[in-house]
C-alpha cells in the first residue's frame, strides 16, 4: 500500500514527487496510509506546475471510509503510485 511521502511515477516531463496527505489515524509502518482524495505535492515541467489528488485505490480495502492507494493506482494528474510499503499489501 502507498503511504504519505511515498513517490509517484511522474508523467511526461513532470518528475516523481511525494504524496502530501494521509489518514490521521491509520498507519502502515508507522506512516499515515494514503487514500483516494488525499493530496499530492505539486510537481513541475518547466514553468507549468500542478498539484493533484489520489484518483482511485483498492476496490475493497478502506481507511476512514476511503479506498486505500496501492502501487500502480492512478493519481488524478496522470501519474501512478510508485513506492509503497515493503510488507503491507492490499489485494495482492
What positions do the PLM features span?
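Intrinsically disordered, low-complexity proline/glycine-rich segments
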Residues: 1-92
Amino acid at each position: 500500500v502507498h503511504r504519505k511521502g511515498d513517490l509517484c511515477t511522474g508523467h511526461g516531463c513532470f518528475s516523481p514527487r511525494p504524496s502530501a496527505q494521509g489518514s490521521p489515524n491509520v498507519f502502515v509502518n508507522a506512516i499515515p496510509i494514503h487514500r483516494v482524495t488525499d493530496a499530492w505535492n505539486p510537481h513541475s515541467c518547466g514553468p507549468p506546475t500542478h498539484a493533484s489528488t489520489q484518483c482511485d485505490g483498492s476496490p475493497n480495502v478502506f481507511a476512514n471510509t476511503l479506498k486505500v492507494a496501492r502501487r500502480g493506482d492512478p493519481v488524478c494528474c496522470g501519474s501512478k503510485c510508485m513506492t509503497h510499503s515493503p510488507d503491507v499489501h492490499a489485494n495482492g
